[in-house]
């Protein structure tokens, strides 16, 4: 059994000295620490996010679940067609969204998500638990029945 993680490795840290590693971390603390934690917990098969061909992972019968972090920044009227593409490519296997987060500068829980985004989240919720970031996101998504 294996887990697939949709992610593009952008930097190989091992080739840089410590000062440069801290520089990278400071520019993207949350995502870098977050991805490292997912790697340590699941030891996933890394799947290129933007350059995925069907033969990259469709035939991986050992992958039972897929993980995405692409929904950490949900904004009004935004759609996520690349996440739909992930769902299409993995068939009926679960795509687990880690740290789903609604973003509103006014912190308004009555935020209006694009209908396609609501449909996407409902489709994902049929296969996996939606891991949301905090009470604000839970309340905002609850307004859409999620």
Language-model features and meaning:
Residues 1-129, 135-146:
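Aromatic- and Gly/Pro-rich donor/ligand-binding loops
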């Amino acid at each position: 059994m294996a887990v697939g993680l949709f992610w593009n490795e952008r930097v190989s840290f091992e080739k840089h000295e410590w000062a440069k590693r801290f520089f990278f971390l400071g520019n993207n603390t949350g995502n870098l620490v977050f991805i490292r934690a997912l790697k340590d917990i699941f030891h996933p098969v890394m799947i290129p996010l933007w350059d995925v061909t069907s033969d990259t992972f469709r035939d991986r019968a050992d992958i039972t679940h897929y993980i995405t972090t692409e929904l950490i920044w949900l904004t009004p009227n935004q759609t996520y067609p690349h996440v739909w593409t992930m769902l299409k490519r993995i068939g009926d296997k679960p795509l687990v969204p880690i740290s789903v987060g609604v973003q509103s500068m006014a912190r308004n829980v009555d935020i209006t998500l694009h209908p396609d985004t609501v449909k996407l989240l409902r489709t994902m919720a049929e296969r996996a638990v939606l891991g949301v970031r905090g009470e604000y996101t839970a309340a905002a998504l609850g307004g859409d029945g999620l």
